[in-house]
C-alpha cells in the first residue's frame, strides 16, 4: 500500500489506484478499503479493467507484459501510442501507421516483429519527455522524483 502525496494516482494497493477500484466496485470508498484490498480482488480488476480491453492477447508474446504494464500505467490510449511509435521506429516514413491511440489490425500487424527492448526504449523516452520537455508535468516539479523508478520499471519487464 502506498499513498504518496506527490503521486497523482493517490492511494494505491497492488498497483490499483483508488479511482480504478471505485470505478470497479461502483461506489466511493475510503483509503482504508484500498489498504485492505486483497490480491485476488486486484487480479480481478487487472483482468476486467485492463487486460480484456487492451487486446494484449493479440500482440506477440515478447511484448505483451511490457505493453500490459503500460496500459495500467498510462491508460490504454497512451500505451497504444507508445506501441505505435515503437513500431514506426522500425518502418520507413511512407509505411508509418497512425499514432492515434487505437489498437486496431494495423497496429497489431505492425507489432508482429517488435522486440521487447524496442518497446522499453520507446517507453523510457516517453517518461523523459514527460518530465523534461514541457509536458503536463512542467508545473509539477514534484513528479521529477519518480523518474528513476519509472525508468527502472521500463527495463524490469
Predicted segments, located by residue:
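Cell-wall polysaccharide-cleaving catalytic domain and substrate-binding groove, primarily
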Residues: 1-157
Amino acid at each position: 500500500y502506498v499513498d504518496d502525496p506527490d503521486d497523482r494516482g493517490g492511494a494505491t494497493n497492488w498497483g490499483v489506484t483508488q479511482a480504478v477500484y471505485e470505478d470497479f466496485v461502483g461506489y466511493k470508498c475510503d483509503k482504508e478499503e484500498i489498504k485492505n484490498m486483497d490480491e485476488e480482488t486486484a487480479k480481478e480488476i487487472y483482468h476486467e479493467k485492463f487486460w480484456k480491453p487492451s487486446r494484449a492477447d493479440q500482440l506477440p508474446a515478447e511484448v505483451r507484459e511490457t505493453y500490459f504494464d503500460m496500459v495500467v500505467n498510462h491508460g490504454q490510449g497512451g500505451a497504444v501510442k507508445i506501441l505505435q511509435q515503437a513500431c514506426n521506429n522500425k518502418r520507413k516514413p511512407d509505411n508509418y501507421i497512425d499514432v492515434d491511440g487505437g489498437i486496431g489490425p494495423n497496429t497489431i500487424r505492425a507489432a508482429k516483429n517488435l522486440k521487447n527492448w524496442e518497446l522499453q526504449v520507446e517507453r523510457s523516452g516517453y517518461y523523459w519527455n514527460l518530465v523534461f520537455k514541457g509536458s503536463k508535468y512542467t508545473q509539477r516539479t514534484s513528479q521529477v522524483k519518480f523518474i528513476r523508478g519509472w525508468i527502472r520499471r521500463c527495463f524490469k519487464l
